[in-house]
Amino acid sequence: MENPSSNLEKLQQDCYNEWMSLQAKRITELKEAISTGEKDDNKLLDLIRTAIRDFGDYARKRSEHSRRFSSNYFAPTWNTCLENALLWMGGCRPSSFIRLVYAMCGSQTEHRLTNFFNNTNHDIDSNLSMALGETRGGIGGGESMSDLTAEQLFKINELHLKTVEAENKLTKVSASLQEDTADTPIAVAAFYKEVIGQADVVVERALDKHEEDMGGLLVEADKLRMTTLTKIVDILTAVQAADFLLAGKKLHLAMHEWGKSREHRRLEASGGDSGGNVTRE
């Protein structure tokens, strides 16, 4: 007879694999729209709305799959160790979306200024246009993020403060749930049981309740991620939003690949002794 827990974990992992494949597909679509100098805001907006809807669908599926076994999402076996070390409530911190905006803005501004001062083969008007962000076609490639206005930066900073505050509230709830495991009945039962880990109906009920509460926390965290993502996109122009989403998806997939590479190097360095870790695909 198959283990229901194993079946559910497979569903969770399949859901994740589908999500990662979808990210790769959206990257291709966004890059194509940006690289071809697509000036049709409606087309870009359709891609942006699709990307937002993708995350909403993924969060809904995660919620359904976490009702009985939510702990799988807080240290997923399908993630690399690097990714799990960076997890916050089963995913990335919503405030990291905003940090990505700041990083892209700063990087592209520096890039343009460097081009302005180093590009001595062009006349001053050409250099000035480049520094001001007047790129050919006025489209993406990351350059659009250096065109953020003072009003946009103010709104993003305001959103950053509110997001961090919301994160802190959820972190406090998580800390409280973790502390509950060192309280009655779990800790007391562990102390008095002659056989360590011996089955206990009361403990199982308490752990089921803990898992249920953690599942609720995951849902709230995903809601905050969704809200933050949507508000950032609302602040940005269509081109900026496309650049931002492209950067976020590339970072997500890159962290997974970097994590696998690091684990592979460690495995080789240890002479093939994985220390009990499962080889990740």
Swiss-Prot record:
Single Gene Ontology BP annotation: DNA-templated transcription
GO molecular function, one term: sequence-specific DNA binding
Region (Disordered): 262-281
Domain DOG1 per the UniProt entry, residue ranges: 9-265
A Pfam family hit: DOG1
PROSITE patterns found in the cross-reference section: DOG1
Disruption phenotype: No germination phenotype.
PANTHER family xref list: DOG1 DOMAIN-CONTAINING PROTEIN (PTHR46354), PROTEIN DOG1-LIKE 1 (PTHR46354:SF7)
Protein name as annotated: Protein DOG1-like 1
UniProt organism field: Arabidopsis thaliana (Mouse-ear cress)
